[in-house]
């Protein structure tokens, strides 16, 4: 049995398809974050991009997400050192720090079901940005570095 690519390759060595498959589809990166100007601490909100499907935790227009005018960021290998804003459970962040994938990750389980069952996605937890006046009222957790 061969070693899975995420255990045998660095992030830089992965193909585009392998890189894309690391995303568990939790939707947490589609939540707006706030940064404390004094401490640079990052705070997550439950305020989501209007393109996020709240049931599937996927972008409603994934192929065109960078041209839709939204603030969607492309995660690229040359920005790995900037991934501290991603959730602690993000495969890009975990593997970039020499850690392993969580047991519920779709690459290990074959589907998103275990991720949703482990309460690791944003399913049922979001409000859309168009419905929010003060994002500070929607802070849900702080990233842990």
UniProtKB/Swiss-Prot annotation:
<dbReference type="InterPro" id="IPR008228">
    <property type="entry name" value="UCP006173"/>
</dbReference>
<dbReference type="Pfam" id="PF03692">
    <property type="entry name" value="CxxCxxCC"/>
</dbReference>
<protein>
    <recommendedName>
        <fullName>UPF0260 protein VC_1058</fullName>
    </recommendedName>
</protein>
<dbReference type="InterPro" id="IPR005358">
    <property type="entry name" value="Puta_zinc/iron-chelating_dom"/>
</dbReference>
<comment type="similarity">
    <text>Belongs to the UPF0260 family.</text>
</comment>
